[in-house]
From Swiss-Prot:
Originating species: Mus musculus
Full protein name: 5-oxoprolinase
Annotated stretches, region: Disordered: 1248-1273
Chemical reaction(s) catalysed: 5-oxo-L-proline + ATP + 2 H2O = L-glutamate + ADP + phosphate + H(+)
GO biological process: glutathione metabolic process
Compartments in which it is found: Cytoplasm, Cytosol
Keywords associated with the record: ATP-binding, Cytoplasm, Hydrolase, Nucleotide-binding, Phosphoprotein
One Gene Ontology MF term: 5-oxoprolinase (ATP-hydrolyzing) activity
Compositional bias per record (Pro residues), positions renumbered to this chain: 1259-1270
Length: 1288
């Protein structure tokens, strides 16, 4: 056996379709290989086969397949694998049982209670990973010194704890033995507060291993962080995936002599570090493959481009990964993959459902790319297997892919080349739809050629991929144009120039091994060992010594672990982190002090406080110096430097580059002659003028016109991107431009939201993301709205239009308006809307409006939180703004708005705002968000011209109108075909008996409808009155649900609809009426009535279950999940929020640590869903035990009238609110009340179930294979932001 330099080093990326092998051979030269990950006819394991081939070729010795390979010539093997990801996607992991604290058996099913898709009535959600649940009799509480509590114990965080009930191991033993007899051998153990008191989990784990369980994942070991829900999901994923990974590793080892005993074998983890194969676990493996690519460009492109920040762009067949590197890895500590939230360090790799295999559609006049994908089978149309038309087909039609450069592996026999003819045929069908649409309008437009249609889809795909890059950079205060675009992956080279140009980037860097950069990254990566523990300390001089002691202990653990792997101390470096947040907020940042040396006012490990303040300012634009800083976790990352040293350079070339051939590629101006070069024949110094194609074995690079490529010393390609030419289009409808403008308009609203979230200070806006930002036309009509909070959808438009009518000409540059009044389009008073007009030179009136609506935690009134259950007038609910100039002539009117916010204090029994500082800060943030919108609108007008931008504003509204008309026409046609009338109706009641009535008359010819709410009840004395804007929001939400696919959500959705709402009714009350319950309760009933009229689904729980708890010291508010209604083809989802709300619920451990309550139960309410061919979803049972005297308020519905069933389905069970006094007396509180509670009292909330659908005696169809959820999942911080934004 020779020295490591005389042996082979392999780095292997085992992907879902291909396995890439990168080998450094003896002598230092490199060999690369790409082969199919699955080819059972020829080999059992792709990585082993790749190693065999290279050893055979390099050594010139025949190595028969199937025999264990001699390892004497192998020094190391590094691998990234999608084994864990695929097992998660396909739900092919180990059989698992969940062991959880009694009372929480359904906690992971309920999760955050938010649904992933606001507008999908079926509420598709991933099934839990565990097969069975065992409730463990044990309970740990945070110590509060109540009488009879006993002596406290100290947790590892420093918190004092009360062991209310030790683990009953005797009772648990029999349950575990039962699991073993049923064939379950893997456990996830998740107990309340085990992040700080792990002893109970350890006792359970010891018993389970003694009984013979082969794998036990303790949540306190897998990820010791507070919040039981994500920690529980992580432990389940670990128990589900680790046995699968271990089996794969053992199978891989058997392919080698001695089972790789003398070979260093390392696997890439999700955090970008390598780990020994024995320490490679499921919860740390889901990004194993993509992480290699980030390491690859961070160690190559970043260095070669002089330390300029880099955006990684990895475009594959089904999705695209986007990431960022600026000198250090960017990690997230909670992210979802395949619907499972993992609480573990992961590189922030943002995956979007847009890739070469993304399908192309023409829908209601709009070019649509994805998110559906052709997958590997059948693949794109050009694969010759009958697949759909995709982005790859569009590129092939445009001449940007050359079939001759691909191997003949396509067709049923996998022996044919790519088929341009199949691509053209599939695209021609879509082109016919496009041209039919263009010919059908009142002013027929010019027909589009096949190439123009293909080009349109490519441009739309590019814009779709630009949006997450903008979000990833601008969300953290970075300018995307200041970055280099590092392009890798099989499909990215065809799009890199266009994407860089659209983002204003000057440079694209494509590594010479870009087609297998993930494998290269594995070769260059270091071995990492991390140690982390939770903490509960303030960041103050008094705690610095404790923090240093903890960090030193963790550092010692990391060093010992790395030295045990053979690293010397000189090869090991460590980096310390503190997970910090401001007191009273949830926004924690994991900060390193590497760039902030220790001072006399910091821990010895570094000035973490300065690092925190600097990063907080950069990401959010402000700091909160008056608040203390809290340490949630301490963490140390140890690195053993072990990456290979690659010295490849390219020879200087004196002659011109060799042109392999000249082909024809289609660009904006038509076909152009395009030289083709082979990457392997290019050398250092060669310069290539665009357009041209550069072909490699693994990728195709398109250098667009106006761009110039050069080969640099390392053999990489650097492309200088020319500036984007001015956009010369006219005001006539162009479906391609319509799709691009749809993205651009939405991007403006999204970026406004990013600025608002960054600069706001309150928890509601900054962390719960309870806000919306929107763009409006000169008439106040909605153009784009992001995100889609249902209750805001139609209401903001009413607000802007009211201000236009109210103020007339009294609106000038530098003015900003504030409004929340229900009669002015408001939903309820805490939702403050800030409106800014957009003026343009030469125009006397505003050309657009931008607005932001945010939920302020308090604006005064009779109760804290400004949501009183018993209000009878609007004034009791807080400060009222009909039309208020928040900024006048560019000056923020702080004194006047302060006076208005304090004005409710002048009313008997009321208070002014209880948090003026946050109100003012958030209002300034809303002004700043609007200003960003003005800037972006100005850039759009500057690029296209005012006439064009306003024309496409109208076109995009007309597109939404067309989609709704198509839906109404299809609904009417379906009824007519069945001999049914074109009129439908529905009626339901609020619990006080007030009817909500609806009659809908469909006009089949026009595709329009009249929605008539006549007959609805009168305005009520309480607060269930819903302003007209609420009904419009409910209607636009329902229309979007009924359309059933993504459409632009704007004014056009309501254009085909006439809405009749009687004045003075509960749906259009007088200006003085109380409305807080209308926003959160009546809105749900309106939705039930609309969907019931259309027969779309049975009633959902119809309630938000509003619960408020408060005293002089604290205040808490939550809304609670229930059952969703069943529909034609689906059972209702249990334990989820429905329709007009999607609020996430506070994690049980956070709830108990911050508020004086014990959460005794949070589980499903079996049998509460209505029976039917398809069952309604079950509600939940949530029981709170109080530890202090407080005022409990409940504001609920469906306590008298049951959620209806449809087509023979039975209704769901009514809700129930029970107060259980300490002495055992149980009282039914009714639907709406306030009551004083005392220590030991309990509140037990039973939420309603959903209605059933279809006759219960009709058997439901047998379940088929569960769909992958989603088949090509989005992930990363951008996705998590949008998911959180929609969960309000």
């Amino acid at each position: 056996m020779g020295s490591p330099e005389e042996r082979f080093h392999f780095a292997i990326d085992r992907g879902g379709t291909f396995t890439d092998v990168f080998a450094q051979c003896p002598g230092g030269h490199v060999r690369v290989l790409k082969l199919l990950s699955e080819d059972p006819a020829n080999y059992a394991d792709a990585p082993t086969e790749g190693i065999r081939r290279i050893l055979e070729q390099e050594r010139g010795v025949l190595l028969p397949r199937g025999r264990p390979l001699d390892t004497s010539h192998i020094a190391s093997i590094r691998m990234g694998t999608t084994v864990a990801t695929n097992a998660l996607l396909e739900r092919q992991g180990e059989r698992v049982a969940l062991l959880v604290t009694r009372g929480f058996r359904d906690l992971l099913h309920i999760g955050t209670q938010a649904r992933p898709d606001l507008f999908d009535l079926a509420v598709p959600m991933p099934e839990v990973l565990y097969e069975e649940v065992v409730e463990v009799d044990e309970r740990v509480l945070l110590y509060r010194g109540e009488p009879g509590a006993g002596s406290p114990v100290k947790g590892c965080t420093g918190d004092l704890l009360e062991i209310q009930q030790p683990v009953d191991l005797a009772a648990l033993r029999g349950k575990l033995e039962g699991l073993l007899t049923r064939g379950i051998h893997s456990l996830a153990v998740v107990l309340m507060h085990s992040y700080t008191w792990a002893q109970h989990e350890q006792q359970v784990g010891t018993l389970a291993r003694e009984l013979g369980f082969t794998h036990v994942s303790l949540s306190s070991e897998v990820m010791p962080m507070v919040r039981i829900v994500p920690r529980g999901h992580t432990a389940c994923a670990d128990a589900y995936l680790t046995p699968t990974i271990q089996r794969y590793v053992q199978g891989f080892r058997r392919g080698f002599q001695g089972q790789l005993k003398n070979v260093q074998v390392l696997f890439m983890r999700s955090d970008g570090g390598l780990a020994p194969m024995d320490a490679f676990s499921g919860s740390r493996a889901v990004l194993s493959g993509p992480a290699g690519g980030v390491v690859g460009y961070s160690t190559t492109t970043y260095q070669l481009e002089g330390g300029q920040p880099v955006i990684g762009f990895d475009m594959g067949g089904t999705s695209t990964d986007v990431s960022r590197y600026a000198g250090e890895f960017e990690h997230v500590f909670e992210a979802s993959t395949a619907g499972v939230t993992l609480q573990a360090p992961q590189l922030d790799i943002n995956t979007v459902a847009a890739g070469g295999g993304s399908r192309l559609f023409f829908r209601s006049g709009l070019f649509v790319v994805g998110p559906e994908s052709a997958g590997a089978h059948p693949g794109p149309a050009c694969y010759r297997k009958g697949g759909p038309v995709t982005v790859t087909d569009a590129n092939l039609v445009l001449g940007r892919l050359l079939p001759a450069s691909f191997p003949c592996i396509f067709g049923p026999g996998e022996d044919q080349p790519l088929s341009p003819e199949a691509s053209r045929k599939a695209l021609e069908a879509v082109a016919m739809e496009v041209n039919s649409f263009l010919a059908s309008g009142p002013c027929p437009a010019s027909q589009l050629s096949l190439e123009e249609v293909a080009m349109g889809f490519v441009r739309v795909a590019n814009e779709a991929m630009c949006r997450p890059i903008r979000a990833l950079t601008q969300a953290r205060g970075h300018d995307p144009s200041a970055h280099v675009l590092a392009c890798f992956g099989g499909a990215g080279g065809q799009h890199a120039c266009a994407i860089a140009r659209a983002l204003g980037m000057d440079t694209v860097h494509i590594h010479r091994h870009s087609g297998l950069l993930s494998a290269l990254g594995l070769a260059l990566a270091d071995v990492v060992h991390e140690a982390q523990e939770p903490c509960s300390l303030s960041y103050t001089p008094e705690t610095f010594a404790q923090l240093d002691q903890r960090l030193s202990r963790l550092e010692e653990q990391c060093v010992d672990a790395l030295q045990a792997q053979g690293f010397s101390r000189s090869q090991i470096s460590t980096e310390s982190f503190l997970h910090l947040r401001y007191q009273g907020t949830d926004c924690a940042l994991m900060v390193s002090a590497n760039q902030h040396p220790a001072t006399t006012c910091s821990p010895r490990a570094g000035d973490f406080g300065a690092a925190f303040v600097e990063r907080y300012m950069r990401e959010f634009g402000f700091i909160i110096p008056e608040r203390s800083v809290v340490v949630d976790d301490v963490r140390v990352r140890g690195t053993g430097r072990s990456g290979l040293q690659l010295e490849e350079t390219s020879k200087i070339q004196s002659g011109p580059p060799h042109v392999e051939k000249v082909t024809q590629c289609y660009f904006e101006g038509g076909y152009q002659e395009t030289p083709v070069y082979l990457l392997g024949e290019l050398g250092y110094g060669h310069q290539l003028q665009g357009p041209c194609l550069i072909i490699d074995n693994n990728s195709t690079i398109l250098v667009e016109p106006g761009c110039q490529a050069e080969v640099i010393e390392t053999g990489d390609i650097r492309i200088s991107v020319g500036a984007e030419a001015p956009s010369m289009i006219d005001t006539k409808l162009d479906p391609i431009q319509l799709s691009i403008f749809s993205h651009r308009f939405m991007s403006i609203a999204e970026q406004m939201g990013r600025i608002l979230q960054r600069t706001a200070i309150s928890t509601n806006i900054k962390e719960r993301l309870d806000f919306s930002c929107a763009l409006f036309g000169p008439d106040g009509g909605l153009v784009s709205n992001a995100p889609h909070i249902p209750v805001h959808l139609g209401a903001m438009q009413e607000t802007v239009q009211f201000q236009i009518q109210h103020l007339g000409a009294d609106l000038h540059p530098g003015d900003v308006l504030l409004s929340n009044h229900p009669s002015a389009g408001g939903s309820h008073l805490p939702d403050l809307t800030v409106i800014t007009p957009v003026f343009w030179p030469g125009q006397s009136r505003p050309v657009f409006y931008v607005a932001s609506r945010g939920h302020h935690a308090d604006i005064g009134g009779i109760t804290p939180g400004s949501m009183p259950p018993h209000s009878t007038t609007l004034q009791q609910e807080g400060a009222v703004f009909l039309s208020f100039k928040l900024v006048q002539g560019g000056v923020f009117q702080e004194e006047a708005v302060t006076e208005a916010l304090q004005a409710p204090g002048k009313i008997s029994g009321c208070s002014g705002t209880r948090n003026l500082h946050d109100n003012l800060s958030d209002l300034r943030a809303q002004v700043a968000a609007n200003q960003k919108g003005i800037q972006l609108v100005g850039e759009l007008i500057g690029q296209y011209g005012l006439d064009v931008v306003q024309a496409y504003m109208g076109h995009i509204q007309a597109n939404a109108e067309l989609a709704v008309r198509d839906m109404l026409r299809a609904f009417g046609t379906s009824r007519q075909a069945r001999g049914l009338p074109l009129e439908v109706s529905a009626k339901d009641h609020m619990d006080d008996g007030s009817p909500i009535c609806l009659h809908v008359q469909i006009n089949l010819n026009q595709g329009s409808a009249v929605f008539d709410f006549s007959g609805s009840g009168s305005e009520v004395f309480g607060n269930l009155n819903a302003p007209r804007a609420i009904t419009l929001s409910a209607l636009i939400y329902c229309l979007r649900c009924l359309v059933g696919r993504d459409i632009p959500l704007n004014q056009g959705c309501l254009a085909p609809v006439q809405v009749i709402i009687p004045k003075g009714s509960i749906l259009d009350p007088s200006p003085e009426a109380a409305v807080v319950g209308g926003n959160v309760l009546t809105s749900q009933r309106v939705v039930d009535v609309i969907l019931g009229a259309f027969g779309a689904c049975a009633a959902s729980q119809g309630c938000m279950n509003n619960v408020t708890l408060g005293n002089a010291r604290m205040g808490y508010y939550e809304t609670v999940a229930g059952g969703a209604g069943a529909g034609p083809g689906w059972h209702g989802r249990s334990g989820v929020h429905s329709h007009m709300t999607n609020t996430r619920i506070t994690d049980p451990e956070i709830l108990e640590s911050r508020y004086p309550v014990i959460l005794r139960r949070f589980e499903l309410r079996p049998g509460s869903g209505g029976r039917g061919r398809f069952r309604g979803g079950d509600g939940v049972v949530r029981e709170l035990v109080f530890r202090e005297e407080a005022l409990l308020s409940v504001l609920t519905e469906r306590r008298a009238f049951q959620p209806y069933g449809l087509h023979g389905g039975e209704p769901g069970t009514r809700g129930l609110n029970l107060l259980i006094r300490k002495d055992g007396r149980t009282v039914n509180l009714g639907g709406k009340t306030s009551v004083t509670v005392y220590p030991g009292d309990a509140f037990c909330l039973h939420t309603p179930g959903g209605g059933g659908y279809g006759d219960p005696e009709d058997p439901a169809p047998p379940p088929g294979s569960p769909p992958l959820y989603p088949a090509f999942p989005e992930r990363g911080s951008v996705y998590e932001y949008r998911r959180a934004q929609e969960a309000v």
